Amino acid sequence: MLRADAMTKLDHQDLVARMCALQRELRGVLREHMASQGVEHLSRTVRDDKGDTIFGIDVEVEERLLRRCEEWGEEQHFTLVGEGLAEGGVEFGRSGRGGPPFRLLVDPIDGTRGLMFDKRSAWCLMGAAPDRGPDTQLQDIEVAVMTELPTTRQNISDVLWASRGEATGGARDDLVRETSTALGVAPSGARDLRHGFASVSNYFAGGKALIAELDDAIATRAMGGWNPDKAEVYSDQYICSGGQLAEVALGRDRFVLDVRPLVYTKLGVASSLACRPYDLAASLVATQAGCVLCDPFGAPLRAPLDVTTNVAFACYANRAIADLLVPIVREEVTRLLG
């Protein structure tokens, strides 16, 4: 006989399988859509929501996602939370149906801007948390899956998943041969930034000078000074928070920092051009792989499971790099943005 607490636990294995299958289906829908439409159609603005701007490339994927959630709701009670939906999410199924209710935080296409111009992969992100109503937090997520959405020039796509308490898993899908092979997920073991990628998000106009000054200050202190004859730390402005975390988890980046909400506060402006909780829906993939995810001051990252909260975050490839950088980042962020 199951204990009462065991009966209320989410079925992690089932959720991983379902989310992987759903994301692979959405990836296929998107590839067909991209193959049949031009850049002008994909990049057109469809609507502006509280969460973000919805472009033409988003529409087909959104429609398929909602259709599949309706079918899933025939056997499971859950609430879908994502941009473009009702502020409190959309409820599927009814109480008592299936396993314990959960909230599914989704960003169907994280990195839209790069993908709609066929420049760089985006990612489909999902994270499931026990349903605690409006009090559900980002850190409550127990299961996460993220799937690479490649450009039309690319036939390989990575799929990453994580369950709380388990090592991150991965697969590399060959979209031509329709095969999948195991993919090891291991962050960099480097103990510093030398000859590695370390980036401070600085995508859009407004506050760029402040962010650049912060970026320089962190790198200079971390490296013990600046050598004008050497390129020792590299920056990658990947307009995709989920993609940034994947780069760290897969060992390609050592550090990423996004302080845009703090910059807007410093400038005395309100802006939605920032990371939102749904952009971090699959952050469990990075943390279960061994990365250190926190706020810019080194405190645990906390955010509601919604679509409107601006989130500042830092991700370090390993504990050694975090120990090196957290004090530097904290001091420089406080000095420049405090």
Locate the predicted segments by residue:
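Buried hydrophobic packing segments
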Residues: 65, 69, 124-128, 248, ...
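DPxDG-like acidic metal-binding loop motif
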Residues: 97-165
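N-terminal subdomain of lithium-sensitive/metallo-dependent phosphomonoesterases centered on the IMPase/IPPase/PAP
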Residues: 1-109, 320, 334-338
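Alpha-helix termini
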Residues: 33-36, 70-77, 131-136, 221-230, ...
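A short glycine/serine-rich beta->alpha loop
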Residues: 49-54, 110-114, 233-235, 271-272
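An extended, acidic
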Residues: 19, 23-26, 30, 96, ...
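Short alpha-helical patches at coil-to-helix transitions and adjacent helical residues
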Residues: 59-62, 119-121, 279, 283
